[in-house]
């Protein structure tokens, strides 16, 4: 199914509130691009969306989102970071800040700017200059112990997504243990168990973005 047609926009923002910038991070293969695709498809009818993807040497994630019809091609921008992925979202986020500016020049009435980081380790976090909300994605296939390994992505992100719950029996992971460890490491910060390929848990992520991002009163 093709993404819906969006009408042409003027170059001046007409909405009172600034766009919400949502950073999506996590290790390689955890499901970041899948989450971004599902979020775009779930929210594009109600919100004006644009997406920015980060890869080190290619624009593969941009291509995947475009082929999947997550959004019209012009609303998806790929950024080649050319180095450590975490640098482009934290220490020197200028390349992504420039990408955000370019997208908002094209689509000044965007409600949400999704920014997907390149795959990285558990220490990666988004600069507060770049992201208003951060979602960190890990997956069950990475091992039952992943939540208790900690790191800023697991302990400090606004929402932790534990993806691929359907693989737990195949890798010998206990989901109850993972949930308990996530709660211990995160305290009051929320987390959600997901099987994104089956859309299981996606509604929780959407509602979190809407509530935390003040998109709905």
Swiss-Prot record:
- Look up the record and give one Gene Ontology term from the biological process aspect: urea catabolic process
* Alphabetized UniProt keyword annotations: Chaperone, Cytoplasm, GTP-binding, Nickel insertion, Nucleotide-binding
Q: Does the keyword Transit peptide feature in the UniProt annotation?
A: no
Family annotation (Pfam families): cobW
Q: Region annotation Disordered: residue ranges?
A: 1-24
Compositional bias segments (type: Basic residues):
1-18
Q: Give residues annotated as binding GTP.
A: 26-33
- Give the subcellular location: Cytoplasm
- The leader peptide range reads none
User: Which Gene Ontology CC terms are recorded?
Assistant: cytoplasm
GO molecular-function terms, A-Z? GTP binding; GTPase activity; nickel cation binding
Q: Which Gene3D superfamilies match?
A: P-loop containing nucleotide triphosphate hydrolases
GTP-binding keyword on record: yes
> Function, please?
Facilitates the functional incorporation of the urease nickel metallocenter. This process requires GTP hydrolysis, probably effectuated by UreG.
Homology family? Belongs to the SIMIBI class G3E GTPase family. UreG subfamily.
How this chain assembles, per its entry, is: Homodimer. UreD, UreF and UreG form a complex that acts as a GTP-hydrolysis-dependent molecular chaperone, activating the urease apoprotein by helping to assemble the nickel containing metallocenter of UreC. The UreE protein probably delivers the nickel.
Q: Which NCBIfam families match?
A: ureG
- Record-given protein name: Urease accessory protein UreG
Which organism does this sequence originate in?
Paraburkholderia xenovorans (strain LB400)
């Amino acid at each position: 199914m093709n993404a819906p047609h969006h009408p042409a926009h003027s170059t001046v923002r007409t909405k009172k509130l600034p766009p919400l910038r949502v950073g999506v991070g996590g290790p390689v293969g955890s499901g970041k691009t899948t989450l971004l695709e599902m979020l775009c498809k779930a929210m594009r009818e109600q919100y004006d969306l644009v997406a920015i993807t980060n890869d080190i040497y290619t624009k593969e994630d941009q291509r995947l989102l475009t082929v999947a019809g997550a959004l019209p091609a012009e609303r998806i921008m790929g950024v080649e970071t050319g180095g450590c992925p975490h640098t482009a979202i934290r220490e020197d986020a200028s390349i992504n800040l420039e990408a955000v500016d370019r997208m908002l020049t094209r689509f000044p009435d965007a409600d949400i700017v999704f920014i997907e980081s390149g795959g990285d380790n558990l220490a990666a976090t988004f600069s507060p200059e770049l992201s208003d909300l951060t979602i960190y994605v890990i997956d069950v296939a990475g091992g039952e112990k992943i939540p208790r390994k900690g790191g800023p992505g697991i302990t400090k992100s606004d929402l932790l997504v534990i993806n691929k719950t359907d693989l737990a029996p195949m890798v010998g992971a206990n989901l109850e243990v993972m949930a308990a460890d996530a709660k211990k490491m995160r305290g009051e910060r929320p987390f959600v168990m997901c099987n994104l390929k089956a859309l299981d848990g996606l509604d929780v992520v959407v509602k979190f973005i809407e509530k935390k991002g003040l998109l709905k009163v």
